[in-house]
Amino acid sequence: MAFVEVTKKDHIAVVTMNRPEALNALNKAVFTDLEVALDDVEKDDEVYVVIITGAGRAFIAGADIGEMAPMNVAEGLAFSELGNRILMRVDMMEKPTIAAVNGFALGGGCELAMSCDIRVASEKATFGMPEVGLG
């Protein structure tokens, strides 16, 4: 997994979005890696708690607009459905999930944090849904 790292210690899995140069923006590769990471922690009976966080100065600064811009309607819908599937998976996970928000949690990042059972935010954390101002 290139964009998501999983570390496990003392029955805790830490899932880290690792694309700090892009403020951990969500694209297909990140979603794919995140699905693999969720498969791993859900199946591991030694993991009791899952913490989701972001590397660098952002939790997740939303979707990767550069990847989304050229998408046609069908591609955009598929991307949205993939994101929604992941959000529902985190929301319905039997293991407790904690969002450790260390910076920007915008758009899909805010949604992912809200999908977790508990949110812990640093003083530098910023939550928002900037896309509501579009259109």
Regions found by a protein language model. Give the residues of each.
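Conserved CoA-thioester-binding segment of acyl-CoA-metabolizing enzymes
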Residues: 1-55, 88
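Hydrophobic/aromatic residues within transmembrane alpha-helices
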Residues: 15, 52, 64, 112-113
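A short, glycine- and basic residue-enriched loop/turn
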Residues: 20-23, 57-58, 62, 68, ...
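Glycine- (often His-adjacent) and acidic-residue-rich active-site loop
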Residues: 35, 46, 54-89, 105
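CoA-thioester-processing core
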Residues: 86-94, 100, 106-135
